């Protein structure tokens, strides 16, 4: 009997200690200080990493108020968290707890074998939520990041507060012939240890900023170099995974209680304007939650980071946009 009591007592001590440890970790997270802005020169060094249950180590940047509402900024194809670096400080200074992950195969995250579909990315993202202790968040995605956010919203609706789709289209694989053409012309011919040419990278990241942006040249040079050094395996897995991605069967299961904002540039030649009406129908988006920026291309958050962030913040706060005509102020 005494032995049983002793065992029970030890068990209770372990449970209590475990609970105290978790509470301590939460308190430490809430008390830590995070940057409100990060320079382009310091961006890469500001990355942390976490091991995920999906088997990869994911790199990420963390900013803002640790006690604030969690907001995830997700980058596009062959990019990394730097993609949102020009806009991230607006969200951090507005009081959000901002996370900017590097998707698998990109940035400083692992690049395992196998094609990376949007389901793969969404599953990684859920594992990131679990690893970081995030229950629910606002998700903002650009291009491939928006495809990931769409997929995540349809697979894990209980973890989505609101979502923002920037430069997006319905995810139906070969629908985007631009990707298939670029892969055939520039990625497939590469040697196993080769990298895309400077000319291709210049075209891939062709951007005409519409705002005065500090250190934009440094930003763009880093974006190009960080994508160009990716292995052929990574480029192949990213491209072919995207071309193979098709979530058409998931769209009927969209949870209508999750508000969706759609932002698009009128000059976007990658995620074409002809698909915007259909995208809005799939996610029940009305005129108060859609804006097309006149004269802006695919990389909205590169070209007009302040306007992009300001419009997203206004929508998050009020459920509507300050203007919907797309005219740049």
Each model region followed by its residue ranges:
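Flexible "cap/lid" loop of the alpha/beta hydrolase fold
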Residues: 154, 163-193
